[in-house]
Design a protein with these regions (language model features):
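Conserved Ser/Thr-centered positions that define the repeating blades of beta-propeller domains
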Residues: 62, 183, 242-243, 291-297, ...
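Hydrophobic core segments of beta-strands in well-ordered, beta-rich domains
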Residues: 48, 97-99, 149-169, 191-195, ...
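Surface loop/turn signatures of beta-propeller and other carbohydrate-active proteins
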Residues: 29-33, 67-86, 108-151, 170-173, ...
Length: 496
C-alpha cells in the first residue's frame, strides 16, 4: 500500500471515529409502546421528528438518574412532517430519553420499525428559516412551534415585551411554556425563545407582568414580576421575577400564591391601582371573575367576584383584564366558545371599580363584543404603556380550527396592536378600537430617491398590491401599479 492511500484511509477512519463520538444513540424496546434511548452527543440540539397525525409520546429526559425535563411530542411513526429541537447543551453530552407512546401500538407495526429511531439526529444549529407560504409579515408569529394567548406584556425603556403561550415541541397545543419576543415599534419583533418553563406545579398557562417601580415585592426596584397559572393536577397561581428587564426569570420560592377548588381557576392579570394605592389582581374562576388586592404582590386578599348573570355565558370565561379609561373602568372577558359567529371571542363590560368591587353600568342581558370577527381572542393589554395609552394585542385565531390551520413549521399569529378608547352612543358606553399609530407608521414608509439616468429594479416575493411612481420637476408623473389578484401591471401617465 502506498503512502497517499494509507493517509486517506487514516483520515477516513478519523472522521468516522469523530462522528461516532459526536453522536451515539441506541434504543432499548421495553414493550409495544415503551422504549428508552441513550444519546451521547457534543452538539447542542437533538432533533426530534414529528408526525402530526400521531398521538403524543411522553418523553422524560434523564440525567444522572434524575428527570431534568419532561414533555409530550408526536414522535414520527410512519413519516416525518418536521423536526423540533431539544436543547441538551446543559446536560454534559449524555442523556437518557424515556419514551412512552400513547396507546397500544401493536396494531400499526413493531415499535422498532418506527421512523423516529432513524430520523432522530444531533446538530449544533437548528434551521429556523421560514418555509411557510402563509406566514404573516406585519403580524407577530413564533419562529417555529405553536403559539396562542399573549401573556405578560409590558413596556419599559422604549421596548415592548410580548410573552406568549408556546409549545416548543410541536405546532399544535401542548407543553404550555412562556416564550418571549421584543419590539421597538410593535411591528418588527425579535425572538428570545423560552423564558418560563413547566415545573413540578404544572405547565405555564396565561398571566401578566408588572414593573414594580417601588420594590413593593422586595425583588428589587423596577423588577419585572410575572404572574401565571401553574396548570398541574389543579390550577394555581404563581410568580416569577426578573431583574434584567424580562430577559430571564427566577421563580418565587413560595409558589403557589393563590389556590382554589374551582377547576377553571386561571389567567391572573395584575395592575397598580393608583386611586387606592394598592395592587389589584383579577382572574377567571369558572363563569366569573375574582378580584383580589395586595400591598406586596405576594400576599393577596379576596375582594369580590363579578359575572353571575351578566353578558354571555356560552363558554368558559378566561384571560381577563381590568382597565381605567377616563372616569370609567372596562372589564375585558374572553370566552370560549360562545362568540357571536362561533368559537372564541372577546366581550367586555363598562362600569366602575373602587379597588374592591366592579359594578357594571349596563343591564345584565347586554353583551358587548370587542370584535365581531372569528380570529380575535385572548385580548389583553400592555402594562406600563407610555403616554397613558391602552395598547392591546389579541391572538389571531379561533379554538374551532386553531390546531388545523394550513401551516406546520409554526401555527398562529397575533393580531395587529390596537389602542383602546371609550365613547358613548344612545346612552351606552362602548370601547373604541383602532390600529395603533405604529401600524400606520409601518405602512407609510415608502422608499424614494432621485434617478441620475436609467434604472433597473427587480421586485420579488410580492404578496400584495405594489406601485412605483416616477416624476420630474415639471410635475409629470408615471404611476405603475401591480395588481396581485389579477397579476397584471397598470401604467398611468400624467403629463403637463
Amino acid at each position: 500500500m502506498n503512502q497517499p492511500i494509507m493517509n486517506r484511509k487514516i483520515k477516513l477512519l478519523a472522521i468516522c471515529l469523530f462522528i461516532t463520538t459526536t453522536f451515539m444513540h441506541a434504543q432499548t424496546f421495553l414493550s409495544s409502546n415503551h422504549a428508552m434511548k441513550r444519546v451521547k452527543t457534543a452538539d447542542k440540539y437533538i432533533l426530534l421528528p414529528v408526525e402530526e397525525e400521531e398521538g403524543y409520546a411522553h418523553i422524560r429526559v434523564i440525567k444522572d438518574n434524575q428527570v431534568v425535563k419532561e414533555f409530550n411530542c408526536k414522535l414520527a411513526i410512519n413519516k416525518t412532517d418536521y423536526n423540533v429541537p431539544l436543547d441538551v447543551s446543559e446536560y454534559g453530552g449524555e442523556v437518557l430519553l424515556d419514551i412512552q407512546f400513547s396507546g397500544d401500538k401493536r396494531s400499526i407495526g413493531l415499535i422498532n420499525n418506527f421512523v423516529c429511531w432513524k430520523d432522530i439526529k444531533a446538530t449544533n444549529v437548528f434551521d429556523s428559516k421560514n418555509r411557510e407560504k402563509f406566514r404573516s409579515i406585519y403580524h407577530h408569529t413564533p419562529v417555529y412551534g405553536w403559539m396562542n394567548d399573549p401573556n405578560g406584556m409590558f413596556y419599559k425603556d422604549g421596548v415592548w415585551h410580548l410573552y406568549y403561550q408556546y409549545n416548543p415541541y410541536g405546532s399544535q397545543w401542548e407543553n404550555m411554556t412562556w416564550a418571549h419576543s421584543t419590539s421597538t415599534d410593535l411591528i418588527h419583533w425579535k425572538n428570545h425563545g423560552e423564558v418560563i418553563q413547566p415545573d413540578a406545579l404544572g405547565t405555564i398557562f396565561s398571566g401578566s407582568s408588572v414593573v414594580d417601580k417601588e420594590n413593593t415585592a422586595g425583588f428589587g426596584k423596577d423588577a419585572v414580576v410575572a404572574f401565571y397559572t401553574s396548570a398541574g393536577a389543579a390550577q394555581t397561581q404563581s410568580i416569577a421575577y426578573s431583574t434584567d428587564n424580562g430577559e430571564t426569570f427566577k421563580k418565587y420560592v413560595n409558589n403557589p400564591i393563590l389556590t382554589s377548588d374551582v377547576p377553571d381557576f386561571r389567567d391572573p392579570n395584575v395592575f397598580w391601582n393608583e386611586e387606592v394605592k394598592q395592587w389589584n389582581l383579577i382572574l377567571a374562576a369558572g363563569q366569573q371573575m375574582n378580584i383580589y388586592s395586595s400591598k406586596n404582590l405576594k400576599d393577596w386578599k379576596y375582594e369580590s367576584s363579578f359575572g353571575e348573570g351578566y353578558g354571555n355565558h356560552g363558554g368558559v370565561w378566561e384571560c381577563p383584564d381590568l382597565l381605567k379609561m377616563g372616569d370609567k373602568w372596562v372589564l375585558i372577558c374572553n370566552i370560549n366558545p360562545g362568540g357571536p359567529f362561533g368559537g372564541s371571542a372577546t366581550q367586555y363590560f363598562v362600569g366602575s371599580f373602587d379597588g374592591h368591587k366592579f359594578t357594571c353600568e349596563s343591564k345584565p342581558e347586554v353583551t358587548k363584543w370587542m370584535d365581531y370577527g372569528k380570529d380575535h381572542y385572548a385580548t389583553v393589554s400592555f402594562s406600563n404603556a407610555p403616554d397613558g395609552r391602552i395598547v392591546v394585542l389579541p391572538w389571531m385565531s379561533n379554538w374551532q380550527y386553531a390546531n388545523q390551520v394550513p401551516t406546520q413549521q409554526f401555527r398562529s399569529a397575533n393580531g395587529l396592536p390596537r389602542d383602546l378608547g371609550l365613547y358613548s352612543y344612545n346612552g351606552e358606553d362602548y370601547v373604541s378600537v383602532k390600529p395603533s399609530p405604529e401600524v400606520f407608521a409601518a405602512f407609510e414608509k415608502k422608499p424614494s430617491g432621485r434617478l441620475q439616468s436609467a434604472a433597473y429594479i427587480e421586485v420579488t416575493n410580492i404578496k400584495s398590491n405594489a406601485s412605483i411612481v416616477l416624476s420630474n420637476d415639471k410635475g409629470e408623473r408615471v404611476t405603475m401599479v401591480f395588481d396581485i389578484i389579477f397579476k397584471f401591471l397598470v401604467c398611468v401617465v400624467l403629463l403637463f
